[in-house]
């Protein structure tokens, strides 16, 4: 697939490494639009929040045990998926789409069903990267301090 992708990039970019020089004068975007996390016709659902909490916790718990790619709900997931999950939770909280209590309840339910492992550490880490006031650059950065 690399040759196919390169051909498409080359067709648009030519010899240029990027499109930084391509200004779109016809596009006028206000700051409020950049901050709007709404999706036309979409909504934040309890199922979506629960899934993000579950995936975030399950991935972090496995990562803390040294596994970087994890089967979660019959899909192979990695840090990028967990990053999306925790970022969505953080963003939904910041913009008032969900409540912290809802996230905590889903965490409680997830840990109630968990077996042995590093679940308490995973939860503390998820709270740090998803429930904090500031969004950390990447969820594994504070996690490195917890690796044996």
Tell me what each language-model feature is.
Residues 1-148:
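Non-catalytic helical/linker scaffolds that mediate oligomerization, partner binding
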């Amino acid at each position: 697939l690399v040759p196919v992708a390169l051909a498409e990039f080359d067709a648009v970019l030519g010899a240029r490494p990027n499109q930084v020089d391509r200004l779109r004068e016809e596009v006028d975007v206000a700051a409020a639009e950049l901050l709007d996390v709404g999706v036309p016709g979409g909504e934040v659902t309890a199922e979506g929040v629960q899934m993000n909490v579950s995936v975030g916790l399950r991935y972090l718990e496995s990562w803390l045990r040294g596994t970087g790619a994890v089967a979660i709900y019959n899909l192979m997931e990695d840090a990028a998926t967990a990053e999306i999950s925790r970022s969505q939770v953080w963003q939904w909280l910041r913009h008032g789409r969900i409540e912290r209590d809802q996230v905590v309840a889903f965490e409680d339910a997830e840990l109630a069903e968990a077996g042995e492992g590093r679940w308490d550490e995973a939860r503390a880490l998820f709270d740090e990267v998803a429930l904090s006031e500031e969004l950390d650059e990447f969820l594994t950065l504070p996690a490195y301090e917890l690796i044996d």
